[in-house]
Amino acid sequence: MNQVWNIARKELSDGLRNRWLLAISLLFAVLAVGIAWLGAAASGQLGFTSIPATIASLASLATFLMPLIALLLAYDAIVGEDEGGTLMLLLTYPLGRGQILLGKFVGHGLILALAVLIGFGCAALAIALLVEGVELGMLFWAFGRFMISSTLLGWVFLAFAYVLSGKVNEKSSAAGLALGVWFLFVLVFDLVLLALLVLSEGKFNPELLPWLLLLNPTDIYRLINLSGFEGSGSAMGVLSLGADLPVPAAVLWLCLLAWIGVSLLLAYAIFRRRLT
C-alpha cells in the first residue's frame, strides 16, 4: 500500500502545483453560490428559493461539469506517462500495473473529492449563515448527499479516462476520445431515449425504458439527487421515466459504485496488455 500511496501523493502534489484543486474548488464555489441566489432569476425571483430547487439546479450543473473535469484531469494518466518516458521508468520499480493505476485513481480521486468538499461546502455554509429560517438539518443532509454523489460521478469518469488513456498511443487521441465520451453520456444518450419516445409515440416498451437510465451514470446521479425530495417536481424529460423505476435509492447508489468498479477493472485489463 505504500507504493500506491506514493503514486497517489505524487498525483495530488501535481494537482496542487498545477492549481487544479484551487481552480476546480473556486469554480464550484462561485457557480454554487450563484445558482443558490440567482437560480430562479428567470421567473422573476432573486435570492434563495428552496433547498430542493437549489440541489436540482446544482445537480444539473454538475452533470455537465463533473464528467468533463474528471476526463480532463486524467485523460493522459497513462498515455502521457508513456509519451514522456516515465511509464517505462515506473515499470522498472517493484510496482505492479494495478498499483500504478490504483495510485493514480486515489490521487485524482482525492483532488476531485477535496474540490467538491471545498467548493460546494462553501455554498452550503453560505446558505446556512445568510438565509434566515433555513432548516439546517435538511440543508446539510441534502448537500452532503449531493457532494458524495458528485464525487462518485467524478470517479466514474476518472475510470473512463483511464480506459481511454490505456487504449491509445497519443495524448491527442485520448483528448478527442474523452470529449466523445462526454458528449455520449451527457448529451447524446438522453437525446436517443427521447427520440425513441417520440418516434414510437410513447409505445416503446414502457417497462424497459426506465431501466435504460441505469446504462448512463449521469442519469443515475441525477435520479439520486432528485429522488430525496418528494413532490419536488424537478424531474423533467427523460428523467421523468425514473419515477417508474421500481428500485430504492440504495440500488441507485450501488449502480454508481458498480460503474466505478467495472470501469476500473476494464482500465486495468487494458493497461495490463499495453506494450510500452
From Swiss-Prot:
One GO CC term, this protein: plasma membrane
Cystines in this chain: none
Major location category of this protein: membrane
This protein's UniProt keywords: Cell inner membrane, Cell membrane, Membrane, Transmembrane, Transmembrane helix, Transport
Membrane topology category: Multi-pass membrane protein
InterPro entries xref list: ABC2_NosY/YtrC-like
Single Gene Ontology MF annotation: ABC-type transporter activity
Compartment(s): Cell inner membrane
Transmembrane region(s): 20-40, 55-75, 111-131, 146-166, 179-199, 251-271
Transmembrane helix recorded as keyword: yes
Pfam families, sorted: ABC2_membrane_2
Induction: Induced in response to denitrifying conditions. Activation requires NosR and DnrD regulators.
Lineage top rank: taxon: Bacteria
Oligomer and partners: The complex may be composed of an ATP-binding protein (NosF), a transmembrane protein (NosY) and a solute-binding protein (NosD).
Protein function: Required for the assembly of the copper chromophores of nitrous oxide reductase. Could be part of the ABC transporter complex NosDFY.
The protein's name in its UniProt record: Probable ABC transporter permease protein NosY
